[in-house]
């Protein structure tokens, strides 16, 4: 015979009859906690300890131990998979089974008078009543909420282009005007000593050395730029000096000639020693000023120079005035030679025949006056536009090709 049947038969035999007035109605199960509270409850203890405690109660010799053993064996028969781990897909269902087992253990001592049929009916009723509560409602709510959250609204659509976010470095040096320092401190023999910055920098590699070599090499453009800048300074000086000298020359001539050119002989006697040097200096200054003015116009590009002249550019007009004054000054070179040789007129009457002073000196004085006016106007025009220099701009626009290291080696060899 099966030992479970023996335990059940002995139990039915030993139980006294229960009067009708004391028979209890089936107790209602305590309300099951919600899923939220079930999640917060601590995990139930393993059933190995419960199985051990039930085995000890079965070994006791009294009837109460037999009753507990029967209940434990019946519970084991009702729950054939107590020790197998349930799948993790449905954790709330596993906790419900554990909670049901705990409720049955707590009521084991108080329901000794209840028959097996009543307990089975009660268990079936519990399962029937708990099945409707297993409906999953929250996933549907979350799906609807997620659908509502994913709905696109008009306020969420941004049509304006977003301005780029300026990215500033967190560790950046303050942007201020840097002030170069002429001295640097170099550590020598465990002490810092002041030294010049230029002397300390030396090329540390072949690349820097090649860069220094290229910088030290002068190209044709560099030479022309240096010459042009130097001659420009000389030209500016010659413009001003020529204007002052031309005015001084014409004033001296008119003072010595007297009122209405009445004392031309006095002019010849006083000015014959200065005629030749004065004419030579005037010619030199006119030549320098004319070349300087032509450099400003940039005659290398004839069409551009003609366009500037047609537009009446100040530099172009000044160059024309200087050139005209130079031509007029050269036309009176023979007269200046005659004035210089006036001291020898007693020996050679053909140079200065008697009564020929007025016919020779009138054109010379008039030409000198025109030269003075042209030089003065040209100087004024050059002063109004000192920054215009087309030749310098043309030289800066030239592209130079630096020689390779091999070509350089061949040239130096």
Swiss-Prot record:
| One example of a Gene Ontology biological process annotation | regulation of Wnt signaling pathway
Q: Where in the cell is it found?
A: Membrane; Cell projection, Cilium
Q: Where is the composition biased (Polar residues)?
A: 112-122
Superkingdom assignment: Eukaryota
Q: How does it sit in the membrane?
A: Multi-pass membrane protein
Disordered: annotated span? 1-162
TM stretches of this protein: 233-253, 274-294, 312-332, 360-380
Q: What is its main location?
A: membrane
GO (cellular component) term, any one: membrane
Protein family: Belongs to the TMEM237 family.
> What functional role does this protein have?
Component of the transition zone in primary cilia. Required for ciliogenesis.
Name-wise, this protein is Transmembrane protein 237B
Source organism per UniProt? Danio rerio
């Amino acid at each position: 015979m099966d030992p479970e049947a023996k335990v059940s038969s002995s139990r039915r035999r030993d139980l006294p009859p229960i009067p009708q007035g004391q028979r209890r109605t089936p107790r209602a199960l305590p309300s099951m906690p919600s899923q939220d509270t079930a999640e917060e409850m601590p995990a139930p203890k393993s059933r190995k300890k419960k199985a051990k405690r039930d085995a000890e109660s079965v070994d006791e010799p009294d009837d109460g131990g037999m009753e507990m053993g029967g209940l434990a064996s019946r519970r084991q028969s009702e729950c054939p998979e107590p020790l197998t781990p349930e799948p993790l897909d449905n954790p709330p269902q596993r906790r419900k089974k554990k909670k049901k087992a705990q409720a049955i253990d707590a009521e084991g001592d108080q329901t000794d008078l209840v028959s097996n049929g009543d307990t089975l009916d009660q268990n079936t009723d519990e399962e029937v009543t708990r099945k409707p509560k297993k409906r999953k409602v929250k996933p549907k709510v979350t799906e609807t909420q997620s659908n509502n959250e994913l709905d696109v609204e008009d306020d969420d659509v941004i049509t304006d282009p977003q301005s780029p976010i300026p990215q500033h470095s967190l560790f950046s040096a303050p942007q201020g005007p840097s002030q170069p320092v002429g001295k640097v401190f170099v550590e020598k023999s465990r002490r810092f000593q002041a030294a010049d910055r230029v002397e300390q920098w030396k090329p540390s590699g072949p690349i820097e050395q090649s860069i220094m070599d290229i910088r030290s090499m002068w190209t044709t453009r560099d030479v022309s730029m240096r010459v042009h800048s130097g001659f420009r300074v000389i030209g500016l000086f010659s413009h001003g000096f020529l204007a002052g000298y031309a005015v001084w020359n014409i004033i001296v001539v008119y003072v010595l000639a007297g009122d209405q050119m009445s004392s031309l002989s006095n002019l010849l006697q006083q000015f014959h020693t200065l005629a030749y040097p004065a004419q030579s200096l005037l010619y030199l200054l006119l030549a320098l000023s004319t070349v300087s003015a032509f450099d400003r116009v940039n005659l290398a590009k004839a069409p551009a120079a003609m366009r500037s002249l047609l537009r009446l550019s100040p530099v172009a007009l000044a160059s024309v005035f200087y050139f005209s004054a130079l031509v007029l000054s050269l036309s009176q070179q023979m007269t200046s030679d005659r004035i210089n040789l006036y001291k020898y007129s007693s020996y050679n009457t053909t140079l200065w025949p008697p009564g020929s002073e007025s016919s020779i000196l009138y054109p010379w004085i008039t030409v000198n006056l025109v030269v003075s006016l042209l030089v003065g106007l040209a100087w004024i025009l050059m002063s109004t536009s000192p920054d215009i220099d087309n030749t310098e701009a043309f030289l800066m626009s030239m592209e130079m090709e630096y020689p390779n290291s091999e070509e350089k080696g061949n040239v130096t060899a």
